[in-house]
């Protein structure tokens, strides 16, 4: 049975985990790190870089480096590189493909199935887009799981049978969620969830960048926002400063040669940022986490004192101000320190993958839909069929009627959100039910059914009870990708995977050829410079020289077949040289030994007397 992995596809960093003997293990990437930056870059030589290599070259390749694409999931965002448009799904798929490759290298087998996590407050379009990214990456997405739910699963699975209430405070690179869950007897049930899809560590970084821009403008009069390369350096410095301020009271931000003045003199940026100043310029961001917390407590119908454990998720929760706020909101409760906020979501996803594959027994995960779902009815009102925080999967039906006499069809407009007026919510999709027989208004009965699957993806059906006619829609307009487009992107991704494989193979061939040229060249040089001259004729050495020259010429080009051919020829000439040296050495030994030499060589010294034997380790034999 194929293995399944758990993937935390994050805004700034992503993690992959797998079950080994029933226990979740976080897989280190090819660079040796347990987290992979969610960054994709298109190098000018055509290579696509993902993760740390992409991050390393971001300063010198600003326009072709894409980060924080998770914030664009479920929208019509795209970026054009070399005349080709890439959607958010395609960029995310690149990150997923790297995680898949790294996990396959670790396990030594192919991976086809995955559980991918999303912020609890992701709407239908964002979930659908995440699933599509997985498909483009060549993964069968078994389940889309909410990040706080995965974290609670990882945290609470070994906490015994006593029922406990857990608050998960998840502040990542680009999104914020707070969820209340109940765990007991192998059941993980989400009671309520709330959040903000546009609040995360990136916003804290941006505040430091803006602060640095203002400081520099005040001292030099130059606006760095007009210099893309300088802004990229500021972003990297801001992220580093934010991390340092989690453990220090102040940090130095020193960027030499950040720009030049009107006279082309280099200018330096050197600022000291204190933790107090950092907290002052980001206080409003922190305050934005308060309301979702209050909403969750109210929706779950509990008091703060009922919370047994607080789990912090996401690297941004390492900021002292965030930890202090959580303690304040929970009445002084100390957040749990036993989980790694960067890895716990992927660990939970791997456990859920194990549940779905039957590797983990007696665990039931009951998730919820984060936002209400309904349709637009007369007067533009949002009529909710499924309230937010309803446990999924779920199915609800309600009967509606026509608004006008002899109305031949009804337009079903599906919305997601909490506003009373439908237009103020997110339109997920619409479809029409036609063929309703003529009848006075209020007579036809149209049954509308909402069905949410375990991934949180919505299916809506409208049925005329009188005629039995029905129409169904699977909500996917939000992502804007048709099946044909997804198939095309999958093929593109596969083609690029083949390109990447070829590129790696070419690099290996080139490296082998260069190494062979170097070693052979050195060997020939040593022969010519040997005391007493070379043991082999110059003619033999010249043939090797010619093969070396051919190999160098091939290496100067791009034809890999030519390099392989030249390498093969050089290998043959090298072997011939080695054989000639061996024969010359044997001949010398025979001449030097005379009659005694023949005896020492084992009798007559003829080739027929050579004996096949094994070399024995004397030390081992004597033991």
Curated annotation (Swiss-Prot):
This is Chaperone protein DnaK. Residues 587-623 are annotated as: Disordered. SUPFAM superfamilies: Actin-like ATPase domain, Heat shock protein 70kD (HSP70), C-terminal subdomain, Heat shock protein 70kD (HSP70), peptide-binding domain. CDD domains: ASKHA_NBD_HSP70_DnaK-like. The keyword ATP-binding applies. HAMAP family: DnaK. The modification Phosphothreonine is found at residue 175. Induction: By stress conditions e.g. heat shock. Residues 594-605 have a biased composition (Gly residues). Acts as a chaperone. It comes from Mycobacterium avium (strain 104). Disulfide bonds: none annotated. Residues 609-623 have a biased composition (Acidic residues). Keywords: ATP-binding, Chaperone, Nucleotide-binding, Phosphoprotein, Stress response. It comes from the Bacteria.
């Amino acid at each position: 049975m194929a293995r399944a992995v758990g993937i935390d596809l994050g805004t700034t960093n992503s993690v992959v985990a797998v079950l080994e003997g029933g226990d979740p293990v976080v897989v280190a990437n090819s660079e040796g790190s347990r987290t992979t930056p969610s960054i994709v870059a298109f190098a000018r030589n055509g290579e696509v870089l993902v993760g740390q290599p992409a991050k390393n070259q971001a300063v010198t390749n600003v326009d072709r480096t894409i980060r924080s694409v998770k914030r664009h999931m479920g929208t019509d965002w795209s970026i054009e590189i070399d005349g080709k448009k890439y959607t958010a799904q395609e960029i995310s798929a690149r990150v997923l493909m790297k995680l898949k490759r790294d996990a396959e290298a670790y396990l030594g087998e192919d991976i086809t199935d995955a559980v991918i996590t999303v912020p609890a407050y992701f709407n239908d379009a964002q979930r659908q887009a995440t699933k599509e990214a997985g498909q483009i990456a060549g993964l069968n997405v078994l389940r889309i799981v909410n990040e706080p739910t995965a974290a609670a699963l990882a945290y609470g699975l070994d906490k015994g049978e006593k029922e406990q209430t857990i608050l998960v405070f998840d502040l990542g690179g680009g999104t914020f969620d707070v969820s209340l869950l109940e765990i007991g007897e192998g059941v993980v049930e989400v009671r309520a969830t709330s959040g903000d899809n546009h609040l995360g560590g990136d916003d804290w970084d941006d505040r430091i960048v803006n602060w640095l821009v203002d400081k520099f403008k005040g001292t030099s009069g130059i606006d760095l926002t007009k210099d893309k390369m300088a802004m990229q350096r500021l972003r990297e410095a801001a992220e580093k400063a934010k991390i340092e301020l989690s453990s220090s009271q102040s940090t130095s931000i020193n960027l030499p040669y950040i720009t030049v003045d009107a006279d082309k003199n280099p200018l330096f940026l050197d600022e000291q940022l204190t933790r107090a100043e950092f907290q002052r310029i980001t206080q409003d961001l922190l305050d934005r986490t308060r309301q979702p917390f209050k909403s969750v407590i109210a929706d779950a119908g509990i008091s703060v004192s009922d919370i047994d454990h607080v789990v912090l998720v996401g690297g941004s929760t390492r900021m002292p101000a965030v930890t202090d706020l959580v303690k304040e909101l929970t009445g002084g409760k100390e957040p749990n320190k036993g989980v790694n906020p960067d890895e716990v979501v992927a660990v939970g996803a791997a456990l859920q993958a194990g549940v779905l594959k039957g590797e983990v027994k007696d665990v039931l995960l009951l998730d919820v839909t984060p936002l209400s779902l309904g349709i637009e009815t007369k007067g533009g009102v949002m009529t909710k069929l499924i309230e937010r925080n309803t446990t999924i999967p779920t199915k609800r039906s309600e009967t509606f009627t026509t608004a006008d006499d002899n109305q031949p069809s009804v337009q079903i407009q599906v919305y997601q959100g909490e506003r009373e007026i439908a237009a103020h919510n997110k339109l997920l999709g619409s479809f029409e039910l036609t063929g309703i027989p003529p009848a006075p208004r209020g007579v036809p009965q149209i049954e509308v059914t909402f069905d949410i699957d375990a991934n949180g993806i919505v299916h809506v059906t409208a049925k005329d009870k009188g005629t039995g006619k029905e129409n169904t829609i699977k909500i996917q307009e939000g992502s804007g990708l048709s099946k044909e487009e997804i198939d095309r992107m999958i093929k593109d991704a596969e083609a690029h995977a083949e390109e990447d494989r070829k590129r790696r193979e070419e690099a290996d061939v080139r490296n082998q050829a260069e190494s062979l040229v170097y070693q052979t060249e050195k060997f020939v040089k040593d022969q010519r410079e040997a005391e007493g001259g070379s043991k082999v004729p110059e003619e033999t050495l010249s043939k090797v020289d010619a093969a070396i020259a051919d190999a160098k010429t091939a290496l100067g080009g791009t034809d890999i077949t030519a390099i392989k051919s030249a390498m093969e020829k050089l290998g043959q000439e090298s072997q011939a040289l080695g054989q000639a040296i061996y024969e010359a050495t044997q001949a010398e030994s025979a001449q030097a030994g005379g009659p005694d030499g023949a005896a020492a060589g084992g009798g007559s010294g003829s080739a027929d007397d050579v004996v096949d034997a094994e070399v024995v380790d004397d030390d081992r034999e004597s033991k």
